[in-house]
Each structure stands twice: as C-alpha cells, then as structure tokens.
Amino acid sequence: MSMKNLSLISACLLLGACGSTPAPLDSGLAAPSQWRYLAAGRSDASDIRQWWKAFGAPELDSLLQRALLNSQDLGAAVARVRQAQASAVIAGAPLLPELNATLGASRQKLLRDSGYSGTDATSDNDAVDSFSAGLSASYEVDFWGGRQAAYRSALESLKASEYDRATVELTLLSGVANSYLQVLALREQQRIARLNLDNAEHVLRLVETRHAAGSATALEVAQQSSLVASQRKQLPLLEQQAHEALITLATLIGEPVQALQVAERPFDSLRWPETGAGLPSELLSRRPDIANAEAQLAAAQADVQVARAALFPKLTLSASLSSGANRAADTFRNPYYNLGANLLAPIFNHGRLRAERDRSLARQEELLETYRKAILTAFADTERSLNSIDGLDRQLHWQQQELEQAQRAFDLSDSRYQAGAETLLTVLETQRTLYAAQDAAVQLRLARLQASVGLYKALGGGWQSDRQGLARKD
C-alpha cells in the first residue's frame, strides 16, 4: 500500500470530525429568588444524604438498607442502566474502523461430464482445492457528524438511565419511610382506642350501677353502650389498616409480609428535624428527575443531528489484504490488497428521511416541554412541602391545647357525673370530643412527620448532580 493511499485514507478519516456539537437548549425558565412558603429561620439546606437518620428511628435505617438490597423496582432500574451502557458501546463502535479476519478452504469436484465455464474443475482435473486468508477493514467517514451524534445520544441516554435509577431510589426510600411511619401511627391509634374503650367501659359500668340504684335511666345505659360498641368497632378497623400498612411496607422492601417484623416503638419518640430548603436555584442540581429530563433532552437534540446527517451522502472506505492458493502450504505466498470507496447518496425515498428529521425535531420539542415541567414540578413540590410544614406546625400548637382541654373537660364531667352534679349527656359529649382530639393528634403528628419526608424527597434526598442545569438562574 503506497504512502499516497495511506494519506488519502487518513485525510478522509480526519474529515469525520466535521460535525459540531450543538449548544445545549435553554429551558427559558428563571428560578425564583426565594421560596414563598419558607418559615423564618429555615433558609439554609443542611447535608441530607442520610435524611432518615434525623427521625431517630434506628429500625428505619435497617428497613431502608433491606429495601435497597431487595427492591424489584430498583433492581429493574439498575438493569436498565446496564442496557444503556451496552447501547452506548454499540453506538460508539462505528466511530472506529471495523476489522475482520477470514480464513477459508474449499474443494470443487466434478461428478460427471466436463464441467462448464463457471467451474474451476475440468475433465482433466476434476477436483480443485482452494485455500484463502485475509484481513479486511471498513469505515464510514463521519462527514456530517451523524455517527458522533448517535454516540452522544447514547451517552446522554445512559446518563438519563442513571438519573432514573436515582429517582427510583429516592422514591423507594421516601415510600418506605412513609409506610413505616404509617405503621407506627396506626399502632398508636390502636393503643389510644384500647384506652378509650377501657374508659368507655368504665363509664358504662358506672351508669349500670346507677341504673340499678335507680339514679340513671335505661336511655343513659343504652347511650353509653352504643359508645362502647362504637369503640369496639374501631379496634378491628385500625387493626386492618395497620396490617395493610405492613403489607405495603413489606412490598416496598421486597420481602413477603410474613418475613417482616416491625418492633414496637412509642410513636411520640419520633422527631422531625428542622430542615432548610436552600435557594430555589440550588434545587436544579439536587433533583435526579430534573437531571433525567435534561439528559433525555440532550439525547433528543443529538438525534436531530443524526436525522439531519442522514439526508446527506455517505462515504464508506474499505481495504483488504488477502492471499490464496490451491495448496494449504502456499496460502500466504500470494498476497494482494484491495482498496475501495463507496459513495451512497439518497435521491428518492418518498420523504422518509425528511419525515425522520421532522419527527426528531418534534421529539426534541416534546422533551423540552417535559424538562420545563420537571423544573416547575420540582419548585411546586418544594413549595407544597414547605407550606405543609408551616401549616402543620401551627396546627400542632393549637392541637396540643385542644387535647389538654378535652382531657380536662372529660375528667371534670366524669367526676361531676359520679357526684350526681352532671348529666350523662355531658359525659358522652366530652368523651367523644376527647377521643376525636386524641385521634386527630396522632394523625396530625403523622402528617407532620410525612411532611418532613416529603420535603426531603422534594429536595432530592441529598442527591447531587455533577452537571449544570439548563434553566436560567438569573
């Protein structure tokens, strides 16, 4: 092979770098300067990479570790990452020449007559052996950057799959935390319901004693008996809900519910941390779903370049070095080479290539809107969590007073009734008020704990992107 031919091939290979990488698309969204519903004194965002430890429940840490090991959703996301890795290797392969080796042997033998012009065997030599060996290389010159763009698209898709795995993990962790809190809250409601049932039965015994003595009516006995029955009905309902929460937790962890044991723990021992939200502009690098949408958009942008490159001619270079003989020992004694170039230009394809380009452009526009929505959704999630925390904190202040006064009212009405200074109707009313206040206190505390989980999730759960967001931060 002459130096002239080598220079020609090298020049063609260098021309493959002609395709340029387009600039990233701008979402056109500006991050707000501050959060609207952030309570005073909570502006700084601390390190929340292990946010679940802040609740003070060591068992939750163990459950989350089991979920990371056993979750089918997370396992499927990891498998999708491996698929994307393989796709990136496949897409990058055409950027380099393809090299193949061949080694062959054949025998041609006439069965009768003298053969014809298409056969090597003749009546004089009715059996012909042939041996060959060779190396061949081919390369499509990437004049228009289509191959490079396809590789870039595959790399962005790989990043998107990795960010998707992080999103699945964040959703899994928050789901396990919420289910665990739900289990403990329902157990607390069961405990309170049993105490209330004991209390209601105590009052019923008192009413029955007074009725036997003639100081209470049958109506009062029936009224208190109805309240006792209502409290008894509440227990199996709460037990059913607790079992359902346990089943949900087991499913998230990836284990059968028979294998899951959640230890008894006082619900009021759980605490919620004081977590800031940082600046809105910082959120863009904390949310894996935003990074996923950004990577998908970048992949679609590269696909547009691929579709545009397909409209232009393709140049394929080929080279081979071969040798052959009629005897195996002489196979490598007759070397020769071939050089070739093939230019393929689309002329008429009934608009297919232009339609593919238009489809890629439409897909890019779709993903740009999806990316914008992901940014706005992230802002909305955080604002919603901050608003929820602020409102629940204020409710908890008054809920505590409501519970204290409801307990005091019941104690007073009960003692006055036993002294004959109050009617049973008042006792019944204060009982119902106390039960409702106790139940509301548990539900409000659960809502506050889950609001903290929601804020951690909205902030990305400590995840940090290694790339710059596309949204404007001015």
Curated annotation (Swiss-Prot):
A lipid is attached at residue 18 (N-palmitoyl cysteine). Keywords: Cell outer membrane, Lipoprotein, Membrane, Palmitate, Signal, Transmembrane, Transmembrane beta strand. Induction: Expression is iron-regulated and under the tight control of the PVD-specific PvdS sigma factor. One of its GO terms (molecular function) is efflux transmembrane transporter activity. Transmembrane segments: none annotated. InterPro entries: OMF, OMP_efflux, RND_efflux_OM_lipoprot_NodT. Disulfide bonds: none annotated. GO terms for biological process: pyoverdine biosynthetic process; transmembrane transport. A lipid is attached at residue 18 (S-diacylglycerol cysteine). Part of the tripartite efflux system PvdRT-OpmQ, which is composed of an inner membrane component with both ATPase and permease domains, PvdT, a periplasmic membrane fusion protein, PvdR, and an outer membrane component, OpmQ. Was originally thought to be involved only in PVD recycling. It was later shown to be involved in the secretion of both newly synthesized PVD and recycled PVD. Belongs to the outer membrane factor (OMF) (TC 1.B.17) family. This is Pyoverdine export outer membrane protein OpmQ. It comes from Pseudomonas aeruginosa (strain ATCC 15692 / DSM 22644 / CIP 104116 / JCM 14847 / LMG 12228 / 1C / PRS 101 / PAO1). The gene is opmQ.
